[in-house]
Protein backbone atom coordinates (compact mmCIF):
# COMPACT_ATOMS: atom_id res chain seq x y z
CA UNK A 1 0.00 0.00 0.00
CA UNK A 2 1.48 3.36 -0.96
CA UNK A 3 2.39 5.65 1.88
CA UNK A 4 0.38 8.81 2.45
CA UNK A 5 2.09 12.15 2.67
CA UNK A 6 3.54 12.73 6.09
CA UNK A 7 6.14 10.00 6.06
CA UNK A 8 6.41 6.32 7.12
CA UNK A 9 2.72 5.62 6.64
CA UNK A 10 1.87 7.51 9.83
CA UNK A 11 -1.10 9.85 10.05
CA UNK A 12 -0.08 13.41 10.81
CA UNK A 13 -2.51 13.72 13.69
CA UNK A 14 -0.89 10.79 15.54
CA UNK A 15 -1.38 7.00 15.25
CA UNK A 16 -1.31 4.79 12.15
CA UNK A 17 -3.63 5.26 9.24
CA UNK A 18 -5.04 2.17 7.40
CA UNK A 19 -7.22 2.65 4.29
CA UNK A 20 -8.57 -0.87 4.60
CA UNK A 21 -10.12 -0.11 7.97
CA UNK A 22 -11.91 3.12 6.96
CA UNK A 23 -15.19 3.65 5.22
CA UNK A 24 -17.29 6.65 4.33
CA UNK A 25 -20.44 7.23 6.38
CA UNK A 26 -23.57 8.47 4.62
CA UNK A 27 -24.38 12.17 5.09
CA UNK A 28 -27.85 12.54 6.60
CA UNK A 29 -29.57 15.93 6.67
CA UNK A 30 -31.04 16.89 10.05
CA UNK A 31 -34.75 16.45 10.40
CA UNK A 32 -36.91 19.55 10.12
CA UNK A 33 -37.63 20.99 13.52
CA UNK A 34 -34.86 18.95 15.12
CA UNK A 35 -33.34 20.55 18.21
CA UNK A 36 -30.16 19.31 19.88
CA UNK A 37 -30.65 17.63 23.25
CA UNK A 38 -30.65 20.01 26.21
CA UNK A 39 -28.55 19.43 29.28
CA UNK A 40 -30.36 18.63 32.49
CA UNK A 41 -31.15 21.85 34.34
CA UNK A 42 -30.35 24.16 31.41
CA UNK A 43 -32.90 26.91 30.63
CA UNK A 44 -35.17 26.26 27.64
CA UNK A 45 -34.04 27.92 24.40
CA UNK A 46 -35.86 31.08 23.33
CA UNK A 47 -37.14 31.59 19.81
CA UNK A 48 -35.18 34.23 17.93
CA UNK A 49 -38.19 36.49 17.58
CA UNK A 50 -38.78 36.49 21.33
CA UNK A 51 -35.09 37.14 21.96
CA UNK A 52 -35.07 40.10 19.59
CA UNK A 53 -38.23 41.46 21.20
CA UNK A 54 -36.70 41.11 24.65
CA UNK A 55 -33.67 43.09 23.52
CA UNK A 56 -35.95 45.96 22.48
CA UNK A 57 -37.83 46.17 25.77
CA UNK A 58 -35.40 48.54 27.55
CA UNK A 59 -35.31 51.10 24.74
CA UNK A 60 -39.03 50.73 24.08
CA UNK A 61 -39.80 51.61 27.69
CA UNK A 62 -37.64 54.75 27.43
CA UNK A 63 -39.37 55.68 24.17
CA UNK A 64 -42.73 55.29 25.91
CA UNK A 65 -41.71 57.83 28.54
CA UNK A 66 -40.57 60.29 25.86
CA UNK A 67 -43.94 60.07 24.10
CA UNK A 68 -45.74 60.51 27.42
CA UNK A 69 -43.88 63.64 28.53
CA UNK A 70 -44.29 65.27 25.11
CA UNK A 71 -47.39 64.32 23.15
CA UNK A 72 -49.39 63.21 26.22
CA UNK A 73 -48.19 65.76 28.77
CA UNK A 74 -51.67 67.27 29.14
CA UNK A 75 -53.17 64.01 30.42
CA UNK A 76 -53.63 63.13 34.08
CA UNK A 77 -54.35 59.95 35.97
CA UNK A 78 -58.19 59.95 35.86
CA UNK A 79 -59.73 61.71 38.81
CA UNK A 80 -56.45 63.23 40.04
CA UNK A 81 -54.14 66.12 39.20
CA UNK A 82 -51.16 63.79 38.75
CA UNK A 83 -49.59 63.52 35.30
CA UNK A 84 -49.71 60.14 33.58
CA UNK A 85 -45.93 60.49 33.26
CA UNK A 86 -45.59 59.48 36.93
CA UNK A 87 -46.88 55.88 36.60
CA UNK A 88 -45.21 55.54 33.19
CA UNK A 89 -41.84 56.36 34.78
CA UNK A 90 -42.24 53.36 37.07
CA UNK A 91 -43.17 51.23 34.05
CA UNK A 92 -39.82 52.31 32.59
CA UNK A 93 -38.05 51.17 35.75
CA UNK A 94 -39.76 47.78 35.55
CA UNK A 95 -38.92 47.41 31.85
CA UNK A 96 -35.26 48.23 32.43
CA UNK A 97 -34.97 46.06 35.52
CA UNK A 98 -36.61 43.10 33.77
CA UNK A 99 -33.75 43.02 31.24
CA UNK A 100 -31.06 43.67 33.84
CA UNK A 101 -30.30 47.15 32.48
CA UNK A 102 -31.08 49.18 35.63
CA UNK A 103 -28.75 50.09 38.46
CA UNK A 104 -29.28 52.14 41.61
CA UNK A 105 -26.76 54.96 41.99
CA UNK A 106 -25.41 54.75 45.55
CA UNK A 107 -24.69 58.47 45.86
CA UNK A 108 -28.12 59.47 44.61
CA UNK A 109 -29.88 56.96 46.85
CA UNK A 110 -28.03 58.27 49.90
CA UNK A 111 -28.86 61.90 49.09
CA UNK A 112 -32.47 61.05 48.28
CA UNK A 113 -32.95 59.22 51.59
CA UNK A 114 -31.33 62.11 53.45
CA UNK A 115 -33.70 64.56 51.74
CA UNK A 116 -36.68 62.32 52.55
CA UNK A 117 -35.70 62.05 56.21
CA UNK A 118 -35.18 65.80 56.49
CA UNK A 119 -38.50 66.54 54.75
CA UNK A 120 -40.39 64.19 57.06
CA UNK A 121 -38.72 65.74 60.10
CA UNK A 122 -39.69 69.24 58.96
CA UNK A 123 -43.26 68.09 58.36
CA UNK A 124 -43.50 66.61 61.86
CA UNK A 125 -42.15 69.81 63.44
CA UNK A 126 -44.51 72.02 61.43
CA UNK A 127 -47.50 69.78 62.19
CA UNK A 128 -46.88 70.23 65.91
CA UNK A 129 -47.00 74.02 65.55
CA UNK A 130 -49.90 76.41 65.34
CA UNK A 131 -49.61 77.15 61.62
CA UNK A 132 -51.69 75.69 58.78
CA UNK A 133 -51.70 71.94 58.38
CA UNK A 134 -49.25 70.72 55.73
CA UNK A 135 -50.54 68.85 52.71
CA UNK A 136 -49.59 65.20 53.09
CA UNK A 137 -50.71 64.62 49.50
CA UNK A 138 -48.13 67.14 48.33
CA UNK A 139 -45.47 65.52 50.52
CA UNK A 140 -46.29 62.04 49.19
CA UNK A 141 -46.16 63.26 45.59
CA UNK A 142 -42.75 64.82 46.23
CA UNK A 143 -41.34 61.62 47.73
CA UNK A 144 -42.71 59.32 45.02
CA UNK A 145 -41.95 61.61 42.07
CA UNK A 146 -38.20 61.58 42.62
CA UNK A 147 -37.69 57.85 43.22
CA UNK A 148 -36.83 57.10 39.55
CA UNK A 149 -34.05 59.69 39.64
CA UNK A 150 -32.09 57.39 41.96
CA UNK A 151 -31.51 54.98 39.06
CA UNK A 152 -29.41 54.91 35.90
CA UNK A 153 -28.96 52.41 33.08
CA UNK A 154 -26.00 50.08 32.80
CA UNK A 155 -23.20 50.66 30.32
CA UNK A 156 -24.60 48.37 27.63
CA UNK A 157 -27.73 50.48 27.32
CA UNK A 158 -25.89 53.74 27.97
CA UNK A 159 -24.29 53.35 24.54
CA UNK A 160 -27.78 53.70 23.07
CA UNK A 161 -28.16 57.29 24.28
CA UNK A 162 -27.77 58.67 20.72
CA UNK A 163 -30.71 56.54 19.58
CA UNK A 164 -32.79 57.95 22.45
CA UNK A 165 -31.91 61.48 21.36
CA UNK A 166 -32.81 60.69 17.77
CA UNK A 167 -36.20 59.34 18.90
CA UNK A 168 -36.76 62.52 20.91
CA UNK A 169 -35.97 64.53 17.78
CA UNK A 170 -38.53 62.64 15.73
CA UNK A 171 -41.22 63.16 18.35
CA UNK A 172 -40.40 66.86 18.55
CA UNK A 173 -40.68 67.09 14.76
CA UNK A 174 -44.34 66.19 15.27
CA UNK A 175 -44.64 68.84 17.98
CA UNK A 176 -42.94 71.43 15.77
CA UNK A 177 -45.30 70.73 12.87
CA UNK A 178 -48.24 71.11 15.25
CA UNK A 179 -46.95 74.50 16.46
CA UNK A 180 -46.44 75.84 12.95
CA UNK A 181 -49.81 74.46 11.81
CA UNK A 182 -51.58 75.98 14.80
CA UNK A 183 -50.23 79.43 13.96
CA UNK A 184 -50.78 79.05 10.22
CA UNK A 185 -54.48 78.21 10.50
CA UNK A 186 -55.01 81.25 12.72
CA UNK A 187 -53.19 83.55 10.29
CA UNK A 188 -55.42 82.12 7.56
CA UNK A 189 -58.46 83.37 9.47
CA UNK A 190 -59.64 80.06 10.88
CA UNK A 191 -60.73 80.34 14.51
CA UNK A 192 -58.81 78.15 16.93
CA UNK A 193 -60.59 75.71 19.21
CA UNK A 194 -58.89 73.60 21.86
CA UNK A 195 -60.15 70.14 20.99
CA UNK A 196 -58.88 68.73 24.28
CA UNK A 197 -61.10 71.08 26.29
CA UNK A 198 -64.03 70.60 23.92
CA UNK A 199 -64.16 66.83 23.58
CA UNK A 200 -62.32 65.36 26.57
CA UNK A 201 -63.76 65.24 30.09
CA UNK A 202 -61.94 67.51 32.56
CA UNK A 203 -61.06 64.48 34.69
CA UNK A 204 -58.59 63.32 32.00
CA UNK A 205 -56.60 66.51 31.36
CA UNK A 206 -54.96 69.32 33.29
CA UNK A 207 -57.18 72.36 33.71
CA UNK A 208 -54.88 74.48 35.93
CA UNK A 209 -52.51 75.69 33.19
CA UNK A 210 -52.73 78.61 30.76
CA UNK A 211 -52.81 76.30 27.79
CA UNK A 212 -53.61 79.01 25.24
CA UNK A 213 -53.56 82.80 25.47
CA UNK A 214 -53.09 85.70 23.00
CA UNK A 215 -49.68 86.76 21.77
CA UNK A 216 -50.54 90.17 23.24
CA UNK A 217 -53.56 91.58 25.04
CA UNK A 218 -56.57 91.76 22.73
CA UNK A 219 -54.97 89.87 19.84
CA UNK A 220 -57.06 87.23 18.04
CA UNK A 221 -53.90 85.18 17.47
CA UNK A 222 -53.02 82.74 20.24
CA UNK A 223 -49.53 81.60 21.12
CA UNK A 224 -48.80 78.13 19.80
CA UNK A 225 -48.67 75.27 22.27
CA UNK A 226 -48.68 72.65 19.51
CA UNK A 227 -52.12 71.44 20.68
CA UNK A 228 -50.48 68.87 22.98
CA UNK A 229 -48.21 70.89 25.29
CA UNK A 230 -49.41 72.26 28.60
CA UNK A 231 -48.42 75.83 27.76
CA UNK A 232 -46.55 77.68 25.00
CA UNK A 233 -43.61 77.97 27.41
CA UNK A 234 -43.44 74.17 27.72
CA UNK A 235 -43.47 73.82 23.94
CA UNK A 236 -40.74 76.43 23.54
CA UNK A 237 -38.42 74.78 26.06
CA UNK A 238 -38.83 71.32 24.55
CA UNK A 239 -38.19 72.81 21.09
CA UNK A 240 -35.08 74.67 22.27
CA UNK A 241 -33.64 71.39 23.56
CA UNK A 242 -34.44 69.73 20.22
CA UNK A 243 -32.67 72.55 18.37
CA UNK A 244 -29.49 72.16 20.44
CA UNK A 245 -29.56 68.37 20.15
CA UNK A 246 -29.76 68.72 16.38
CA UNK A 247 -26.67 70.93 16.41
CA UNK A 248 -24.87 68.27 18.42
CA UNK A 249 -25.68 65.48 15.97
CA UNK A 250 -23.56 64.73 12.92
CA UNK A 251 -25.47 65.42 9.71
CA UNK A 252 -27.12 68.63 10.88
CA UNK A 253 -30.27 68.26 8.75
CA UNK A 254 -30.83 71.96 8.25
CA UNK A 255 -34.49 71.37 7.44
CA UNK A 256 -35.01 70.14 10.98
CA UNK A 257 -33.24 73.17 12.42
CA UNK A 258 -35.42 75.49 10.33
CA UNK A 259 -38.59 73.73 11.46
CA UNK A 260 -37.59 73.78 15.13
CA UNK A 261 -36.70 77.47 14.84
CA UNK A 262 -39.99 78.38 13.15
CA UNK A 263 -41.98 76.46 15.76
CA UNK A 264 -40.02 78.14 18.55
CA UNK A 265 -40.95 81.55 17.15
CA UNK A 266 -44.59 80.47 16.85
CA UNK A 267 -44.75 79.93 20.61
CA UNK A 268 -43.72 83.59 21.18
CA UNK A 269 -42.24 82.47 24.49
CA UNK A 270 -39.17 84.05 26.03
CA UNK A 271 -38.23 81.01 28.12
CA UNK A 272 -37.49 78.93 25.03
CA UNK A 273 -35.36 81.70 23.55
CA UNK A 274 -33.47 82.01 26.86
CA UNK A 275 -32.87 78.25 27.01
CA UNK A 276 -31.67 78.25 23.40
CA UNK A 277 -29.21 81.00 24.33
CA UNK A 278 -27.87 78.92 27.23
CA UNK A 279 -27.33 75.94 24.95
CA UNK A 280 -25.57 78.01 22.30
CA UNK A 281 -23.24 79.61 24.85
CA UNK A 282 -22.27 76.24 26.33
CA UNK A 283 -21.66 74.77 22.87
CA UNK A 284 -19.55 77.80 21.94
CA UNK A 285 -17.37 77.33 25.01
CA UNK A 286 -16.93 73.63 24.37
CA UNK A 287 -16.35 73.76 20.59
CA UNK A 288 -13.90 76.62 20.27
CA UNK A 289 -13.45 79.78 18.25
CA UNK A 290 -14.20 78.59 14.72
CA UNK A 291 -17.56 77.07 15.66
CA UNK A 292 -18.35 80.13 17.80
CA UNK A 293 -17.66 82.51 14.91
CA UNK A 294 -19.99 80.60 12.61
CA UNK A 295 -22.67 80.42 15.31
CA UNK A 296 -22.47 84.16 16.01
CA UNK A 297 -22.76 84.95 12.31
CA UNK A 298 -25.77 82.66 11.86
CA UNK A 299 -27.42 83.99 15.03
CA UNK A 300 -26.96 87.59 13.88
CA UNK A 301 -28.51 86.88 10.48
CA UNK A 302 -31.48 85.09 12.05
CA UNK A 303 -31.95 87.82 14.67
CA UNK A 304 -32.02 90.53 12.00
CA UNK A 305 -34.55 88.56 9.95
CA UNK A 306 -36.78 87.94 12.97
CA UNK A 307 -36.59 91.58 14.05
CA UNK A 308 -38.28 92.55 10.78
CA UNK A 309 -41.33 90.43 11.64
CA UNK A 310 -44.15 91.09 14.16
CA UNK A 311 -42.77 88.27 16.31
CA UNK A 312 -39.48 90.13 16.65
CA UNK A 313 -41.25 93.23 17.91
CA UNK A 314 -43.19 91.20 20.47
CA UNK A 315 -40.05 89.50 21.76
CA UNK A 316 -38.22 92.83 21.95
CA UNK A 317 -40.99 94.29 24.11
CA UNK A 318 -40.53 91.47 26.62
CA UNK A 319 -36.80 91.89 27.17
CA UNK A 320 -37.21 94.25 30.12
CA UNK A 321 -40.41 92.90 31.64
CA UNK A 322 -38.67 91.21 34.59
CA UNK A 323 -38.52 94.62 36.28
CA UNK A 324 -42.26 95.19 35.80
CA UNK A 325 -44.47 93.84 38.58
CA UNK A 326 -47.24 91.60 37.28
CA UNK A 327 -45.42 90.61 34.10
CA UNK A 328 -44.60 87.03 33.19
CA UNK A 329 -40.86 87.59 33.52
CA UNK A 330 -41.20 89.22 36.93
CA UNK A 331 -43.48 86.44 38.17
CA UNK A 332 -40.93 83.82 37.15
CA UNK A 333 -37.53 85.41 37.83
CA UNK A 334 -38.02 88.03 40.57
CA UNK A 335 -41.25 87.73 42.58
CA UNK A 336 -40.70 84.16 43.92
CA UNK A 337 -37.42 85.08 45.59
CA UNK A 338 -38.79 88.35 46.98
CA UNK A 339 -41.84 86.57 48.41
CA UNK A 340 -39.85 83.78 50.10
CA UNK A 341 -37.22 86.19 51.47
CA UNK A 342 -39.99 88.36 52.91
CA UNK A 343 -41.63 85.32 54.53
CA UNK A 344 -38.33 84.30 56.15
CA UNK A 345 -37.89 87.84 57.44
CA UNK A 346 -41.32 87.73 59.12
CA UNK A 347 -40.94 84.22 60.57
CA UNK A 348 -37.47 82.79 61.19
CA UNK A 349 -38.84 79.26 61.55
CA UNK A 350 -39.48 79.27 57.80
CA UNK A 351 -35.71 79.37 57.31
CA UNK A 352 -35.21 76.26 59.46
CA UNK A 353 -38.19 73.99 58.73
CA UNK A 354 -40.37 75.83 56.23
CA UNK A 355 -44.10 76.35 56.51
CA UNK A 356 -45.18 72.84 55.50
CA UNK A 357 -45.78 70.83 52.33
CA UNK A 358 -48.06 72.61 49.88
CA UNK A 359 -48.38 75.80 51.95
CA UNK A 360 -46.60 78.07 49.45
CA UNK A 361 -49.68 77.74 47.24
CA UNK A 362 -52.36 77.29 49.92
CA UNK A 363 -51.25 79.81 52.58
CA UNK A 364 -51.31 82.84 50.28
CA UNK A 365 -52.09 85.20 53.15
CA UNK A 366 -48.71 84.45 54.72
CA UNK A 367 -46.46 84.04 51.70
CA UNK A 368 -48.01 86.55 49.32
CA UNK A 369 -50.06 89.12 51.27
CA UNK A 370 -49.56 91.72 48.52
CA UNK A 371 -51.18 89.47 45.92
CA UNK A 372 -48.25 89.49 43.49
CA UNK A 373 -48.30 87.36 40.37
CA UNK A 374 -45.88 84.55 41.27
CA UNK A 375 -44.71 81.43 39.43
CA UNK A 376 -42.51 79.50 41.86
CA UNK A 377 -39.44 77.67 40.50
CA UNK A 378 -38.37 74.52 42.32
CA UNK A 379 -35.85 75.92 44.80
CA UNK A 380 -37.79 78.87 46.34
CA UNK A 381 -40.90 76.70 46.62
CA UNK A 382 -38.93 73.97 48.38
CA UNK A 383 -37.35 76.49 50.78
CA UNK A 384 -40.74 77.95 51.66
CA UNK A 385 -42.19 74.53 52.45
CA UNK A 386 -39.24 72.63 54.00
CA UNK A 387 -36.63 75.23 55.00
CA UNK A 388 -33.11 76.03 53.86
CA UNK A 389 -31.18 73.08 55.45
CA UNK A 390 -33.43 70.48 53.82
CA UNK A 391 -33.36 72.44 50.56
CA UNK A 392 -29.56 72.22 50.50
CA UNK A 393 -29.71 68.42 50.78
CA UNK A 394 -32.33 68.26 48.05
CA UNK A 395 -30.27 70.63 45.90
CA UNK A 396 -27.25 68.31 46.21
CA UNK A 397 -29.42 65.38 45.10
CA UNK A 398 -30.75 67.19 42.02
CA UNK A 399 -27.34 68.53 40.99
CA UNK A 400 -25.92 65.00 41.27
CA UNK A 401 -28.62 63.73 38.92
CA UNK A 402 -28.29 66.53 36.37
CA UNK A 403 -24.54 67.13 36.26
CA UNK A 404 -22.53 64.20 37.64
CA UNK A 405 -20.96 61.97 34.94
CA UNK A 406 -23.73 62.78 32.45
CA UNK A 407 -23.29 61.86 28.76
CA UNK A 408 -23.59 65.48 27.59
CA UNK A 409 -22.52 68.43 29.79
CA UNK A 410 -24.36 70.76 27.40
CA UNK A 411 -27.67 69.00 27.95
CA UNK A 412 -26.89 68.78 31.67
CA UNK A 413 -26.58 72.55 32.00
CA UNK A 414 -29.70 73.08 29.89
CA UNK A 415 -31.63 70.64 32.09
CA UNK A 416 -30.44 72.48 35.21
CA UNK A 417 -31.59 75.77 33.68
CA UNK A 418 -35.03 74.34 32.93
CA UNK A 419 -35.40 72.81 36.37
CA UNK A 420 -34.10 75.63 38.56
CA UNK A 421 -34.90 78.77 36.57
CA UNK A 422 -37.42 78.49 33.74
CA UNK A 423 -40.24 76.34 35.11
CA UNK A 424 -42.23 75.59 38.24
CA UNK A 425 -40.83 72.10 38.11
CA UNK A 426 -40.82 70.84 41.70
CA UNK A 427 -43.95 68.70 41.31
CA UNK A 428 -44.12 68.52 37.49
CA UNK A 429 -43.38 64.96 36.31
CA UNK A 430 -43.11 66.13 32.69
CA UNK A 431 -40.23 68.48 33.46
CA UNK A 432 -38.54 66.31 36.09
CA UNK A 433 -38.45 63.23 33.87
CA UNK A 434 -37.33 65.16 30.79
CA UNK A 435 -34.32 66.41 32.74
CA UNK A 436 -33.64 62.88 34.04
CA UNK A 437 -33.83 61.35 30.56
CA UNK A 438 -31.30 63.81 29.17
CA UNK A 439 -28.85 63.44 32.05
CA UNK A 440 -28.93 61.10 35.03
CA UNK A 441 -30.65 58.12 33.42
CA UNK A 442 -27.71 57.64 31.04
CA UNK A 443 -24.96 58.84 33.39
CA UNK A 444 -21.77 56.83 33.91
CA UNK A 445 -20.87 55.24 37.22
CA UNK A 446 -17.52 57.02 37.49
CA UNK A 447 -15.94 60.08 35.93
CA UNK A 448 -13.30 57.90 34.27
CA UNK A 449 -15.99 56.03 32.36
CA UNK A 450 -17.30 59.28 30.90
CA UNK A 451 -13.89 59.98 29.37
CA UNK A 452 -13.20 56.37 28.45
CA UNK A 453 -16.62 55.54 27.07
CA UNK A 454 -17.78 58.90 25.69
CA UNK A 455 -21.08 58.49 23.89
CA UNK A 456 -20.71 59.61 20.29
CA UNK A 457 -23.76 61.55 19.21
CA UNK A 458 -22.81 61.00 15.58
CA UNK A 459 -23.93 57.41 15.99
CA UNK A 460 -27.51 58.62 16.35
CA UNK A 461 -27.70 58.71 12.57
CA UNK A 462 -26.58 55.11 12.28
CA UNK A 463 -27.45 53.07 15.39
CA UNK A 464 -24.27 51.84 17.11
CA UNK A 465 -23.49 48.21 17.74
CA UNK A 466 -23.87 46.96 21.28
CA UNK A 467 -20.55 46.77 23.04
CA UNK A 468 -19.45 44.85 26.09
CA UNK A 469 -18.87 46.95 29.21
CA UNK A 470 -15.31 48.16 29.69
CA UNK A 471 -13.31 45.98 32.10
CA UNK A 472 -12.88 47.43 35.58
CA UNK A 473 -9.59 49.25 36.19
Where are these regions (language model features)?
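A membrane-periplasm/extracellular boundary helix in multi-pass inner-membrane enzymes
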Residues: 184-186, 284-324, 343-346
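Interfacial loop-to-transmembrane-helix boundary motif in multi-pass membrane proteins
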Residues: 58-60, 108-115, 151-202, 412
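N-terminal signal-anchor transmembrane segment
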Residues: 29, 35-101, 117-126, 414-422, ...
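Long extracytoplasmic/lumenal interhelical loops at the membrane interface
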Residues: 314-386
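Transmembrane alpha-helices of multi-pass inner-membrane enzymes
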Residues: 90-94, 412-421, 428-473
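Hydrophobic transmembrane alpha-helices and their immediate junctions
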Residues: 293-295, 382-420
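Helix-loop-helix junctions and helix-breaking kinks within/between transmembrane helices
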Residues: 73-84, 123-141, 229-237, 254-285, ...
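Alpha-helical transmembrane segments of multi-pass inner-membrane proteins
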Residues: 166-189, 213-267, 274-285
Amino acid sequence: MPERPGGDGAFQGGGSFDDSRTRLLPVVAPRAGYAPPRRLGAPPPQPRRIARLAERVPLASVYLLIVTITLFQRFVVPGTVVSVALPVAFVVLVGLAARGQLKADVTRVALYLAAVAASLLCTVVVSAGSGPAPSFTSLLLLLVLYIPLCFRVKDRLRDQFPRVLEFYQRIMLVGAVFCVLQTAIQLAGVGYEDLFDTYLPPTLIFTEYNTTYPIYYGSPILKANGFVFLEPSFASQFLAIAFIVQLMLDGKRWGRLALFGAALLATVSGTGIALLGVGLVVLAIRRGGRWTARAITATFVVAVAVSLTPVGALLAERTGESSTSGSSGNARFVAPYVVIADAIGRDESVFLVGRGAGTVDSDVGFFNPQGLLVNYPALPKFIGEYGVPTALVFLAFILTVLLRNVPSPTLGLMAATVYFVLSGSLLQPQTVYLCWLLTGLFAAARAGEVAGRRVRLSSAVEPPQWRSPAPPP
